[in-house]
């Protein structure tokens, strides 16, 4: 449980950092220690809603090119009417709402989410998320994957 809160705290810190344009590395690739700093403007990409959700979103895939990293850390900004399509979850995944409002559906149950809400979706569950209202819905997404070489 403590690990989840630590990951969530890091996610909130990174998402609230100001946007710049350069990736920083403290140590050459393959050496132990150090850090990687990526900024919103470096990784922002206009994308349709994932899982066939539709609409316009801006996806931020932080550290996607970092070797040997199991942690996936993303931010997504949903424009009005956009969504993550309803799909089956394969691994634990955390959604954290930074701003805006959304309608989440998990295993057929709908509920509204807003700033400060964190939702853990478990393997085997089905879920989707739709932006509601006039303001963009901005969320953080975190899950583990097999590390990339």
Pin down the residues of each PLM region:
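Bacterial N-terminal signal peptides that target proteins for export
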Residues: 1-7
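Short histidine-centered beta-strand/loop micro-motifs
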Residues: 63, 83-89, 130-132
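Ligand-binding loop in jelly-roll beta-barrel domains
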Residues: 67-68, 123-148
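Glycine- and acidic-residue-biased ligand/ion/polar-headgroup-sensing regions
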Residues: 90-93, 97-102, 107
